[in-house]
Amino acid sequence: MRTMKIKRDFYLNRLIDAKGDGFVKIVTGIRRCGKSYLLFNLFKTHLLKEGVHRENIVEIALDRKKDAKLRDPDALYDFLVHSTAGKRGMVYVFIDEIQECRRPKGTRRETPEEKAEREQQFYDILNEFRQRKNVDLYVTGSNSRLLVTDVATQFRGRGETIQVNPLTFSEYYAAVGGDKSDAWSRYLLYGGMPELFSMRTDAAKRAYLEGLFKTIYFRDIVDRYELHDDYFLANVNDVLMSASGSLTNPTKLANHLGTVLGKSRIRALLAVTSAC
């Protein structure tokens, strides 16, 4: 991304208001919408300006190689114990892509309950550290892997979700400036994903958005829900996008697609796509 500052005042103020409230702050949203930038850049800058010492800000990025070992729940727990002990004042813990903290899958076929337990052990870690008076927890996670329903259940009412969306036009225009009509046309065409600012050509922007779409709707969803009919998922999404703004329902989709999928299966596919 270019060295331009993108303001996300609405979300930043929500983090500021929630500071030190005893809740786990969960910053969620679709991939690449600016969750990490909000937490590790804008909010961190705010804390430093408020006088928080750098050593009192613990930063973990579980999608990066340098922190890969912390994807193991036991390793993450031990690291947090060590990095928060013996410090004066509040310790602010930032964990990027928290859903990557999970035990590796074994060789035998696991039940849905076993899969959920293996993938959600990080909740126990966060719940324990949330209760420590000198620790303030902030985590990020993608919608396709970290559902609001999971958060509400696992944190027992002590988790606060901040849903981050791509840039609004006002945020977009504040960053790009120039002729407002031209900016509006570009925004309508390509949307408000922050990383588009680093791309100079239309071809690069199209390729980026196509790749992002495939990652979100196919790799993430197919992986999380272990779908075996991703071909039909693609067809359902094609129909939905071509009929944007029109009313539809599972019966109409089934009739239009002419597939062997029934209404119940199409309804399930609609549910998982809306989760993103």
Q: What is the role of each PLM region?
A:
Residues 2-22:
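Pre-Walker A adenine-sensing motif
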Residues 99-138:
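Conserved Walker B catalytic segment
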Residues 5, 163-276:
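Interdomain hinge/linker elements that couple catalytic modules in large macromolecular machines
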Residues 27:
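Hydrophobic anchor at the beta1->P-loop junction of P-loop NTPases
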Residues 94, 136-142, 163:
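Structural recognition of the conserved hydrophobic beta-strand(s) that form the central parallel beta-sheet
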Residues 35-36:
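Conserved lysine of the Walker
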Residues 144-160, 176-177:
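Short regulatory helix/loop adjacent to the ATP-binding pocket of P-loop NTPases
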